[in-house]
């Protein structure tokens, strides 16, 4: 009997379009000799829509439902995703997706799911909290100033100008896929950047700009996590924002990255240490800055990285000899393993 994968995609965050791209790639890569795929779309309004089921590979003309093609007659209660023995693959990016909220819902339903648990998902989603945890683990971070809604913005800008030097990067603390990020060369640009970032979150991070290469390491496993050789994001733009990443195609990837063996070893060790520090499970992608001075800074942990066939995470594992279909199989097996352990802890 084939294993059922419940593919959850869409969502309420600004990254919902990325989620659709990732989910379509997963549904095409699945080994249909082993799996059946049932898909549920989460609309921008947060409604659950039962969409397609696939017992064999979809055709090129098959497309997943989006906010533009919703069939409201297929709206269901969120709990309708439950199926005994099924494993949920929440291909959801950003808030209300990889921030622990959906993970908590799935644990209430008592369903195995791919990826990090409630704690590690919510922790890694918040950039400020992640930085503080990783600092405690001895992992170097780019200098930063945290700003929370209600703070005296003028005083915080003065703190930024005292502790950091322009250019600086302003980021919503609780957002992914480079959404809401701005580069500022002066105080006026910083004020505008803060306004933009506060549109997406009530907690904002201002980081020192560094002249650095962007290097990424893939992580796979539960308590025996393994890492990939690093890959490099090669940009034709000033910084790696949402449009450059997903719309303008101004980014290429160099896998493996052309860096020394010593740097590779440090990055892989730091990535694995960071994953354990947040209590990670299943998968993550760890992003580093490697400066022209030879400094290595851990930028962030992404607990549900982009999963399209051209995304860095699956390509990193392909370079390690694990194909996209095999990667999905391993993630499903890891989900069942962590579910069994979680259930065993409930006495």
UniProtKB/Swiss-Prot annotation:
Q: Which UniProt keywords apply?
A: ATP-binding, Cell shape, Cell wall biogenesis/degradation, Cytoplasm, Ligase, Magnesium, Manganese, Metal-binding, Nucleotide-binding, Peptidoglycan synthesis
Q: How is the cofactor bound?
A: Binds 2 magnesium or manganese ions per subunit.
Q: Which GO terms describe its cellular component?
A: cytosol
What EC number is given for this enzyme?
A: 6.3.2.4
GO terms (molecular function) for this protein are: ATP binding; D-alanine-D-alanine ligase activity; metal ion binding
The catalysed reaction is:
2 D-alanine + ATP = D-alanyl-D-alanine + ADP + phosphate + H(+)
Task: Domain (ATP-grasp): give its ranges.
Answer: 131-333
Q: Which residues does the record give as ATP binding sites?
A: 161-216
Q: Does the keyword Transport apply?
A: no
User: Which EC class heads this enzyme's classification?
Assistant: ligase
What family, per the record?
A: Belongs to the D-alanine--D-alanine ligase family.
- Put simply, this protein is called D-alanine--D-alanine ligase
Q: Which organism is it from?
A: Streptococcus pneumoniae serotype 2 (strain D39 / NCTC 7466)
Question: What lineage is on file?
Answer: Bacteria, Bacillati, Bacillota, Bacilli, Lactobacillales
Instruction: Give the encoding gene's name.
Output: ddl
């Amino acid at each position: 009997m084939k294993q059922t994968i419940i593919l959850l995609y869409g969502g309420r965050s600004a990254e919902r379009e990325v989620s659709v791209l990732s989910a379509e790639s997963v549904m095409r890569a699945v080994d249909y000799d082993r799996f059946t795929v049932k898909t549920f779309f989460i609309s921008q309004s947060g409604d659950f829509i039962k969409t397609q089921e696939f017992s064999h590979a979809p055709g090129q003309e098959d497309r997943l439902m989006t906010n533009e093609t919703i069939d409201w007659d297929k709206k269901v209660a969120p709990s309708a995703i439950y199926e005994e023995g099924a494993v949920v693959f929440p291909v959801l990016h950003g808030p209300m997706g990889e921030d622990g909220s959906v993970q908590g819902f799935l644990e209430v339903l008592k369903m195995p799911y791919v990826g990090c648990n409630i704690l590690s998902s919510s922790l890694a989603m918040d950039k400020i909290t992640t930085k503080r945890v990783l600092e405690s683990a001895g992992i170097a971070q780019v200098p930063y100033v945290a700003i929370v809604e209600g703070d005296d913005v003028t005083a915080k800008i003065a703190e930024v100008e005292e502790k950091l030097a322009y250019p600086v990067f302003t980021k919503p603390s609780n957002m992914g896929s480079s959404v809401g990020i701005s580069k500022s060369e002066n105080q006026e640009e910083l004020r505008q950047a803060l306004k933009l970032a506060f549109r997406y979150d009530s907690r904002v991070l201002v980081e020192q700009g560094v002249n650095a290469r962007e290097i990424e390491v893939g992580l796979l496993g539960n308590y025996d996590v393994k890492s990939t050789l690093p890959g490099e994001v090669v940009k034709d733009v000033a910084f790696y924002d949402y449009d450059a990443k997903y719309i303008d195609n101004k980014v290429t990837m160099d896998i493996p990255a052309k860096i020394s063996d010593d740097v590779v070893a440090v990055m892989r060790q730091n990535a694995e240490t960071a994953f354990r520090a947040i209590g990670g499970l299943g998968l993550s992608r760890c992003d580093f800055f490697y400066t022209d001075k030879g400094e290595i800074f851990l930028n962030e942990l992404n607990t549900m990285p982009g999963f399209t066939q051209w995304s860095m995470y699956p390509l990193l594992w392909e370079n390690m000899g694990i194909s996209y279909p095999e990667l999905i199989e391993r993630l499903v097996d890891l989900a069942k393993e962590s579910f069994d352990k979680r259930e065993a802890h409930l006495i």
